[in-house]
């Protein structure tokens, strides 16, 4: 499926400007979405793209000039390099040093994190914290699953959610922990948001339908895995064997990413006692049903 074409710089609403990270790829889609949020002379920047992408720094400078604003603070949705990687370059090339707050949720279990070469410490937030700037109020939503430190942000003025990588504008997300991820999707569904500003891909206008689609998709994948194992109950399968059955319509270059997700489904099903794992000598899986 061809991806939507996104401009590098676009005003999405009265208080949200998207600056594309200029880092397209199989996992980043059109690139990381970074967002300037607010209406005043100082605004919040959500996410920062990857390190050493001068095109992004140029686009961000253009946005700051065009909207006659500067960066009040930075909030990053999670620790992945395509979201935190640009912080040091922004500090060096735009802000003349990190004399402002860079905030995120702590890793779980906690580990000390330093921001690139600038050795700036993060300001750690918690679920429910409120961050304000002129024209915008953001509420922190702890949404682990994609990563252990993942946050979404509710934009109160628009009944919208900045979803980070919990929900994408196109395709589906990868995750570290499926159990946590499903809980986070349910949490976002309960928000009854109208709109999603995702970490990658275009804006989602039917927020609740998209979140429900993600939940249904994961449940359907789980059923496909169980069906493949039950139809061959005398056999055991490697995770890649199952990818080739369950993700048969997915391009082969995405099979490794698909295997990552499928393995988490297998771990969840094992916890529930529905399947078992054996070593022979590689890890193989069989149905218990």
From Swiss-Prot:
<feature type="binding site">
    <location>
        <position position="80"/>
    </location>
    <ligand>
        <name>Zn(2+) 1</name>
    </ligand>
</feature>
<dbReference type="InterPro" id="IPR001279">
    <property type="entry name" value="Metallo-B-lactamas"/>
</dbReference>
<dbReference type="InterPro" id="IPR036388">
    <property type="entry name" value="WH-like_DNA-bd_sf"/>
</dbReference>
<feature type="binding site">
    <location>
        <position position="119"/>
    </location>
    <ligand>
        <name>Zn(2+) 1</name>
    </ligand>
</feature>
<feature type="binding site">
    <location>
        <position position="119"/>
    </location>
    <ligand>
        <name>Zn(2+) 2</name>
    </ligand>
</feature>
<feature type="binding site">
    <location>
        <position position="165"/>
    </location>
    <ligand>
        <name>Zn(2+) 2</name>
    </ligand>
</feature>
<dbReference type="InterPro" id="IPR041516">
    <property type="entry name" value="LACTB2_WH"/>
</dbReference>
<keyword id="KW-0255">Endonuclease</keyword>
<feature type="binding site">
    <location>
        <position position="165"/>
    </location>
    <ligand>
        <name>Zn(2+) 1</name>
    </ligand>
</feature>
<feature type="binding site">
    <location>
        <position position="146"/>
    </location>
    <ligand>
        <name>Zn(2+) 1</name>
    </ligand>
</feature>
<feature type="binding site">
    <location>
        <position position="200"/>
    </location>
    <ligand>
        <name>Zn(2+) 2</name>
    </ligand>
</feature>
<dbReference type="GO" id="GO:0005759">
    <property type="term" value="C:mitochondrial matrix"/>
</dbReference>
<keyword id="KW-0378">Hydrolase</keyword>
<dbReference type="InterPro" id="IPR047921">
    <property type="entry name" value="LACTB2-like_MBL-fold"/>
</dbReference>
<keyword id="KW-0479">Metal-binding</keyword>
<dbReference type="Pfam" id="PF00753">
    <property type="entry name" value="Lactamase_B"/>
</dbReference>
<keyword id="KW-0496">Mitochondrion</keyword>
<dbReference type="GO" id="GO:0004521">
    <property type="term" value="F:RNA endonuclease activity"/>
</dbReference>
<comment type="function">
    <text>Endoribonuclease; cleaves preferentially 3' to purine-pyrimidine dinucleotide motifs in single-stranded RNA. The cleavage product contains a free 3' -OH group. Has no activity with double-stranded RNA or DNA. Required for normal mitochondrial function and cell viability.</text>
</comment>
<feature type="binding site">
    <location>
        <position position="82"/>
    </location>
    <ligand>
        <name>Zn(2+) 2</name>
    </ligand>
</feature>
<keyword id="KW-0862">Zinc</keyword>
<feature type="binding site">
    <location>
        <position position="83"/>
    </location>
    <ligand>
        <name>Zn(2+) 2</name>
    </ligand>
</feature>
<comment type="similarity">
    <text>Belongs to the metallo-beta-lactamase superfamily. Glyoxalase II family.</text>
</comment>
<protein>
    <recommendedName>
        <fullName>Endoribonuclease LACTB2</fullName>
        <ecNumber>3.1.27.-</ecNumber>
    </recommendedName>
</protein>
<feature type="binding site">
    <location>
        <position position="78"/>
    </location>
    <ligand>
        <name>Zn(2+) 1</name>
    </ligand>
</feature>
<dbReference type="InterPro" id="IPR036866">
    <property type="entry name" value="RibonucZ/Hydroxyglut_hydro"/>
</dbReference>
<dbReference type="GO" id="GO:0003727">
    <property type="term" value="F:single-stranded RNA binding"/>
</dbReference>
<dbReference type="Pfam" id="PF17778">
    <property type="entry name" value="BLACT_WH"/>
</dbReference>
<keyword id="KW-0694">RNA-binding</keyword>
<dbReference type="InterPro" id="IPR050662">
    <property type="entry name" value="Sec-metab_biosynth-thioest"/>
</dbReference>
<dbReference type="GO" id="GO:0008270">
    <property type="term" value="F:zinc ion binding"/>
</dbReference>
<keyword id="KW-0540">Nuclease</keyword>
């Amino acid at each position: 499926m061809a991806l939507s074409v996104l401009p590098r710089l676009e005003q999405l609403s009265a208080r949200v400007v998207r600056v594309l990270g200029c880092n397209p790829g199989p996992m980043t889609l059109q690139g990381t979405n970074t967002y300037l949020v607010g209406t005043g002379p100082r605004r919040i920047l959500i996410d920062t793209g990857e390190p050493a992408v001068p095109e992004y720094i140029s686009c961000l400078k253009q946005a700051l000039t065009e909207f006659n604003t500067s960066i009040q603070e930075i909030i990053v949705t999670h620790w992945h390099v395509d979201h935190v990687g640009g912080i040091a370059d922004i500090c060096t090339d735009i802000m003349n040093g990190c004399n402002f707050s860079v905030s995120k949720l702590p890793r779980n279990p906690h580990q000390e994190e330093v921001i690139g070469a600038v050795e700036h410490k993060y300001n750690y937030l918690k679920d429910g914290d409120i961050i304000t700037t002129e024209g915008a109020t953001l509420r922190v939503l702890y949404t682990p699953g994609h990563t252990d430190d993942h946050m979404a942000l509710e934009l109160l003025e628009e009944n919208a959610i900045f979803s980070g990588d919990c929900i994408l504008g196109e395709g589906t997300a990868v995750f570290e922990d499926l159990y946590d991820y499903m809980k986070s999707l349910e949490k976002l569904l309960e928000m009854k948001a109208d709109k999603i500003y995702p970490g990658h891909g275009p804006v989602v206008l039917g927020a609740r339908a998209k979140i429900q689609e993600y939940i249904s998709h994961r449940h359907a994948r789980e059923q496909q895995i169980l069906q493949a194992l039950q139809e061959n109950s005398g056999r055991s399968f490697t995770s890649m064997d199952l990818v080739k059955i369950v993700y048969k319509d997915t391009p082969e270059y995405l099979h490794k990413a698909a295997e990552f997700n499928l393995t988490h489904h297998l771990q969840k099903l094992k916890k529930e006692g529905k399947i078992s794992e054996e070593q022979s000598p590689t890890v193989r899986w069989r149905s218990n049903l």
